[in-house]
């Protein structure tokens, strides 16, 4: 099993002027730890599950990934996850391409159907009903695939999006892998089977095993090899520096049901120090495979 990080909190010791330096140290610490994935949360406002108010710090995701791309050299980079409503799909494909080119081919597209209504209303971003958001998500996945096809610069005609030209130059160095967040059995996991390179799940090992059974059936329905999909989980109860054995034991149960990557969330304050403190987890998790 591999380890990844998702940075959800930007309230940093030292205040606003300390954020850039701390994020640079996060990138350095993440790579030094041997983790394979570094991601950020993508929201306009802070979300309630962090325990912080909506008014807490929240940086724009792709700008911050560009900053991290310049301060790392090996680790994969992505957002976990971008709401489909946040950016027009043509611009989204160009943005992810830019991160990929500037990082030397390390960008992923992490995407989901969006859920936080308050931030949409707050900034005046349209928030359509859930059925429409999933329609838009599927069209966005198709648009990104077309824009990352160097042999297809033609139009895209969808129900919600119409692009006269799907030009994207330069092309990505490596076609960005697509991680689709969420575990809805009827829509989300079907989209993973059709378009995803990775899923991101949560819940107990038994719940994750059930979701993977559903995903496997969707793969059978669309003729997809289930083994080609990387299985990741968001581990809400992360390790504590100096006390990692309990976390590794818990992740062993997830490895048994087929999870490839555990993604943990550094706290605010001094996240780089926390990453340094849990680095011994990486070789321990590697032994679970």
Task: Label each region the model flagged.
Residues 1-71, 175-176, 204-206, 234, ...:
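N-terminal beta1-alpha1-beta2 module of alpha/beta enzyme domains
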Residues 7-21, 82-90, 174-184, 234-245:
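Active-site mouth loops of central-metabolism enzymes
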Residues 8-10, 43, 82-84, 112-116, ...:
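Active-site beta-loop-alpha junctions enriched in small/polar residues
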Residues 48-52, 79, 85-195, 209-215:
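Internal, glycine-rich beta/alpha segment that forms the wall or movable "lid"
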């Amino acid at each position: 099993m591999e380890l990844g990080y998702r940075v959800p909190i930007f309230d940093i010791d030292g205040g606003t002027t300390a954020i850039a330096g701390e994020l640079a140290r996060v990138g350095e610490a993440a790579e030094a730890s041997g983790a394979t994935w570094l991601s950020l949360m993508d929201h306009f406002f802070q979300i309630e599950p962090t325990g912080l108010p909506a008014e807490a710090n929240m940086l724009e995701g792709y700008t911050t990934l560009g900053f991290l791309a310049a301060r790392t050299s090996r680790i994969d980079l992505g957002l976990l996850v971008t709401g489909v409503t946040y950016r027009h799909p043509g611009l989204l494909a160009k943005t992810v391409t830019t991160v990929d080119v500037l990082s030397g081919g390390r960008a992923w597209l992490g995407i989901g159907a969006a859920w936080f209504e308050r931030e949409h209303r707050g900034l005046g971003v349209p928030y359509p009903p859930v059925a429409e958001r999933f329609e838009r998500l599927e069209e966005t996945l198709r648009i990104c695939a077309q824009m990352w096809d160097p042999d297809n610069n033609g139009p895209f005609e969808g129900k919600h999006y119409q692009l006269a030209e799907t030009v994207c130059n330069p092309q990505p160095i490596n076609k960005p892998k697509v991680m689709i967040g969420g575990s809805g059995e009827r829509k989300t996991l079907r989209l993973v089977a059709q378009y995803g390179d990775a899923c991101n799940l949560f819940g107990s090992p038994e719940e994750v095993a059930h979701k993977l059974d559903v995903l496997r059936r969707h793969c059978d329905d669309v003729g997809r090899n289930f083994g080609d999909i990387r299985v990741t989980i968001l581990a809400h109860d992360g390790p504590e520096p100096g006390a990692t054995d309990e976390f590794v034991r818990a992740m062993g149960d997830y490895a048994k049901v087929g999870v490839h990557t555990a993604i943990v969330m550094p706290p605010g304050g001094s996240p780089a120090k926390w990453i340094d403190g849990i680095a011994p987890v990486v070789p321990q998790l590697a032994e679970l495979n």
